[in-house]
Structure formats: C-alpha cells, structure tokens
C-alpha cells in the first residue's frame, strides 16, 4: 500500500514523459493511463483516472486508455475483487454485462472533464494473469470476446488491444505450435464482416439481456 502510484503522481510522471518525447520527436503519441478497475494495489480505475485528469494528465496524453478482465485466474487471486474463471461464467450474460458497465463509467469521465479524446481499450482478456485452460484458449471464451469487441465499439472505443497475441492461455496464437486459437478466428470473422461505423440498434423483446444485436457498416 505504501508504493501505490496516485493519479496525481501519474499526471506528473506523464508530464515529464511528454516533455522528454517532445524533445526527441513531437509527433510521438502517448496512450494512458492504463489502469484496471479490479486491482487496487496498482490503482483503482475510476479514482486513479479521475485524479489523473484533475491534475492535468490529459495535457500529456493523446489517447485515454484502460484495462479490463472479466474473471479471475487461479494464478493470482485478488481476494474476491472479481469472479473466478469458469466455463459457465464465460458464457454468462452477467459476465458480458460487466464490461459494458465499466465502459459506461469511463465514458462518463470523458463527458465530466469535457475531453475531446479517443477512448481506447489498452488491454483486455476474459481472464486475468495468463488466462485459464479450456476457457480463454477455447470457443467458450469467444462468445464473450465477440460481444466485448462489439459493445466497446458501440461505447465509442476507437481501438481495442487484446492481451495477448502469443503467450500463456489467453493468446490469440498458441505459443508452442503457433497455431491460431478460437479467439483468433473470432477476431478474423469480426474484422472481415464488421465495418468502421456503428449504427444505432435496439432489441425489443422479452429476452432482454439474452439477445444481443449490433449493427455496423
């Protein structure tokens, strides 16, 4: 707890980084502040990001970013901060809804501070700390991934980064064989079929959260 970086300190550090990079090449872009909501030991998302913005952090960055993991790996439990990884949880609508809630809160910060900035998802996967066997490396996690890509686009996120391309159990490509994993094919399908413009759409039926529809062109 003694070594947590505060939003105020991060704003000061990013100011130094901005000045350093400007002295080398002013065209270099900076994305930040890259905080995940579940991990208070390294700074909780809303308090840290709010404090960062209050102390002028936005003057030093070009893209406002945050990190998101929907479930918890056995490798590094965070004492109930989020649900343990299971296949049932991977396809649960409540798991899918969580990311939407936090994206809403990040958008609220953008409006509160009247920011004219692109909102990015700087890092995400269904399960934290390397993922989980038979979940993030299987089609069980692909439903969540596709829904996450769609709703983040609807929520105004210009860019979404996956954790990770190759490595552990949440990569898009298997580390030893270099064979594409299910989420790779899901992403390829998404990129092949989905356009760059989000269209407004609503679902009016009794299924509510269980039927999801997104439209792009």
Predicted regions and their residues:
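Conserved residues at the C-terminal ends of beta-strands
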Residues: 1, 67, 163
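Short, exposed beta-strand "edge-strand" segments with a Pro/Gly-rich flavor and a Y/T-containing core
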Residues: 2-5, 20, 176-179
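Noncatalytic carbohydrate-binding groove/subsite architecture in carbohydrate-active enzymes
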Residues: 5-142, 155
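Aromatic/acidic polysaccharide-binding cleft in carbohydrate-active enzymes
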Residues: 121-212
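Short amphipathic beta-strand and strand-loop transition segments with alternating hydrophobic
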Residues: 213-217
